[in-house]
Design a protein with these regions (language model features):
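Solvent-exposed loop and capping/linker segments of extracellular ligand-binding repeat ectodomains
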Residues: 1-259
Length: 259
């Protein structure tokens, strides 16, 4: 592993070497790191308030980051475990995962208020197990775009995220994988919104599926303003349609064209 203060000049890093940082100072990491199991891994230790950024894959792929973790089981196991000082996560661009690659990665990161995007559409055994467990600062989960579950993939993923009140998924069945969502939403916010495809059976309400007092919404077409603006639907020619709009996905009002 190597570190740099400017992203240009690099020096070899020795595990357990503390790197002091004054406010505003940065340190970059790159290398060929990978954890290999629950007894063989490394974790960052932080004090103060630390914001991470950039591509996490440079820690394992060095100067040629890829989007695959194939063959790297447990690669980032517990990498930020217990980092209460962490206020922002790095980018996690991997689209090909490995077994338990992100297991317990952010466990107990109570200062984390926004989860990184998780773009992978195909899951591996235990890949996100306990990933955000006890991240009490999170209110929204990252979108989960995979349509098929894997054994233990989301097990206890958000367990103890007491502020979590929003989750959007793409999978259409709870079955076919062992304990894939076991206790994944245990001890989260008592009320919240669960967005899912219409095919997903949400009749069973518990911490391993959908919390009992959460609202279930269809994955409706949605526009989000990234800066101040507006949206309207303009009619051309002679068409008729009944359209409704909502700002929360729950309460709906009739819409008039060109409004």
């Amino acid at each position: 592993i190597q570190t740099s203060t400017d992203g240009t000049t690099w020096t070899n890093y020795t595990f357990d070497t503390n790197i002091p940082l004054a406010e505003g100072e940065k340190v970059y990491f790159k290398g060929n790191y990978k954890g290999t199991g629950v007894s063989d891994y490394a974790s960052f230790v932080m004090t103060g308030k630390i914001s991470a950024s950039g591509n996490l894959m440079t820690l394992t792929d060095g100067d040629s980051p890829t989007t695959t973790l194939a063959g790297k089981n447990y690669c980032f196991y517990k990498l930020f475990d217990g980092c209460t000082s962490l206020t922002a996560a790095p980018e996690l661009p991997a689209r090909t995962l490995s077994n338990y690659c992100y297991y317990s990665m952010f466990y107990g990161c109570t200062g984390l208020t926004q989860a990184p995007a998780l773009p992978a559409k195909t899951l591996s055994e235990g890949c996100y197990r306990d990933m955000f467990r006890a991240c009490t600062g999170l209110t929204e989960a990252p979108d989960l775009p995979a349509v098929t579950l894997a054994d233990y993939c989301y097990r206890q993923m958000f367990y103890g995220c007491t502020g979590l009140n929003y989750l959007r998924v793409k999978f259409t069945s709870w079955t076919g994988a062992t304990d894939a969502t076991l206790d994944w939403l245990a001890n989260v916010s008592a009320t919240g919104t669960f967005v899912c495809p219409t095919e997903l059976d949400t009749s069973t309400r518990n911490a391993s599926r959908v919390p009992s007092a959460w609202t279930v919404n269809i994955d409706y077409l949605c526009f989000t303003a990234v800066e101040t603006g507006s949206v309207k639907l303009t009619k051309k020619g002679n068409i008729t349609a009944t359209i409704q709009t909502s700002t929360d996905g729950t309460t709906w009002t009739n819409y008039t064209f060109d409004t």
